[in-house]
Swiss-Prot record:
Positions that bind ATP: 18, 60-65, 250, 315, 387
Lineage: Bacteria, Pseudomonadati, Pseudomonadota, Alphaproteobacteria, Hyphomicrobiales
Single GO MF annotation: ATP hydrolysis activity
GO cellular component terms attached to this protein's record: HslUV protease complex
Subunit note: A double ring-shaped homohexamer of HslV is capped on each side by a ring-shaped HslU homohexamer. The assembly of the HslU/HslV complex is dependent on binding of ATP.
Compartment list: Cytoplasm
Domain of life: Bacteria
Main localization, broad class: cytoplasm
NCBIfam families: hslU, PRK05201.1
Function: ATPase subunit of a proteasome-like degradation complex; this subunit has chaperone activity. The binding of ATP and its subsequent hydrolysis by HslU are essential for unfolding of protein substrates subsequently hydrolyzed by HslV. HslU recognizes the N-terminal part of its protein substrates and unfolds these before they are guided to HslV for hydrolysis.
Originating species: Methylobacterium sp. (strain 4-46)
Protein name, per record: ATP-dependent protease ATPase subunit HslU
């Protein structure tokens, strides 16, 4: 789990997301509170529950981007899901308890990677020995092995083909079956490979011919797993999920009940009712054992264009006590998005054209013009936030992108006049821009 202070978390988010200081502060404090709880001991630690967050703001203002960056910062089991993917328990579709099962799988993957790093040196030596066996045979003399080992480490044999045999786990693509009417059927799915073992892909794998370069990674993973206690990894991962798991629940506004709508609402209000115990704290049965959700942090977000937060069930509103409102983006925000963020759209466009040998530069007034056009189209057509910049920029670069292979070695300067020539007429014609921008 991360030990960053709230200030450090906010400054890290600032590198990728413009503005939205309140939302950044809220998630930074929530993340730091996870660490603070770990420092407590005794009964008090069990009593400290996470303060779940509801982020409200128009589309394209940074809600989802905050979740993406938070996933990398958290250093804890983190899952981002859309609320619209789920249906009420008892209907065809995924029920919300699948969130916890998926989070456990994420936690196991994180814990396994962490443990693999701790045995990396031993696994490296074992993988190297297996590659040498494939190259020179297990009966080769020590001098021959040493000679090939030197060449292998120097990278001289990377393109040479060898035959290796990997122990294949149960195929992951097998269909999953629900058990209807069985207590704990929420446990969900039984993997046929687990039940029938070797009959459907046991430990014996068939030989494969691959290059030495391609053989290294799977052999390393297999040798690492031989050195690890898989049961201990699962137990630690489940404990980590229960204590530090974070779920980002996107598009929560889409599960608000619509006024005047009758009949069963299996993917709206029914999903809200199913979310209540999950967020409040319950025990979910998974194939790795029961998982308690009492200390999992839930961050919900939604645009609330058609509905409003008060349309959520009152009980669900109460379980999301921290409200954060994200502000719509201004012209200055758009300008900063284009120039200040790491891997900004302009940097990406310049780098992509450079691969064709075309040097593209944007003047200051071109950046201003792009920002202004994006804001104008958002206000006159439909406000889709920062995503509008991608549409406008693609329109501006359309001709250059198409002819770039024939223009290698050229330099192209894009100024405000060029931007206006490409998109101004469309931006001013509201009817036309509805379809093109």
């Amino acid at each position: 789990m991360t030990t960053f202070s709230p200030r450090e978390i906010v400054s890290e988010l600032d590198r990728y997301i413009v503005g939205q200081a309140d939302a950044k502060r809220a998630v930074a404090i929530a993340l730091r509170n996870r660490w603070r709880r770990q420092q407590l001991h005794g009964p008090l630690r069990e009593e400290v529950a996470p303060k779940n967050i509801l982020m409200i703001g128009p589309t394209g203002c940074g809600k989802t981007e905050i979740s993406r960056r938070l996933a990398r910062l958290a250093n804890a089991p983190f899952l981002k899901v859309e609320a619209t993917k789920f249906t009420e328990v008892g209907y065809v579709g995924r029920d919300v308890e699948q969130i916890v099962r998926d989070l456990v799988e994420v936690g196991i993957g994180l814990k396994r990677d962490e443990k693999r790093r701790s045995v990396q040196a031993r696994a490296e030596a074992a993988a190297e020995a297996r590659i040498l066996d494939a190259l020179v045979g297990p009966t080769a003399g020590q001098a021959t092995r040493d000679s090939f080992r030197r060449r292998l480490r120097a990278g001289e044999l990377d393109d040479k083909e060898v035959e290796i045999e990997l122990a294949s786990a149960a195929p992951s693509g097998l269909p999953m079956f629900e058990i209807p009417g069985v207590p704990g059927a929420a446990m969900g799915a039984i993997n046929l490979g687990d039940m029938l073992g070797k009959a459907l892909g046991g430990q014996k794998g068939k030989p494969r011919r691959v290059t030495v370069r391609d053989a290294h990674a799977p052999l390393m993973a297999e040798e690492s797993d031989k050195l690890l206690d898989q049961d201990a990894i699962v137990q630690e991962a489940v404990r980590e999920v229960e204590d530090n798991g974070i779920v980002f629940l996107d598009e929560v506004d889409k599960i608000c009940a619509r006024e005047g709508r009758g009949g069963a609402d299996v993917s709206r209000e029914g999903v809200q009712r199913d979310l209540l115990p999950l967020i409040e704290g319950t025990t979910v049965a998974t194939k790795h054992g029961p998982v308690k959700t009492d200390h999992i942090l839930f961050i919900a977000s939604g645009a609330f264009h058609v509905s409003k937060p008060s349309d959520l069930l009152p009980e669900l509103q109460g379980r999301l006590p921290i409200r954060v409102e994200l502000a719509p983006l201004t012209v200055d925000d758009f300008r900063r998005i284009l120039t200040e963020t790491e891997a900004s759209l302009l940097k990406q466009a310049v780098a992509l054209m450079a691969t064709e040998g075309v040097a593209v530069t944007f003047t200051e007034d071109a950046v201003d013009a792009l920002a202004r056009v994006a804001v104008e189209v958002n206000s006159s057509v439909e406000n889709i936030g920062a995503r509008r910049l991608q549409t406008v920029l693609e329109r501006v670069l359309d001709e250059i992108s198409f002819t770039a292979p024939d223009r290698a070695g050229e330099s192209v300067t894009i100024d405000a006049a060029y931007v206006r020539e490409r998109v101004e007429s469309l931006a001013q014609n509201a009817d036309l821009s509805r379809f093109i921008l």
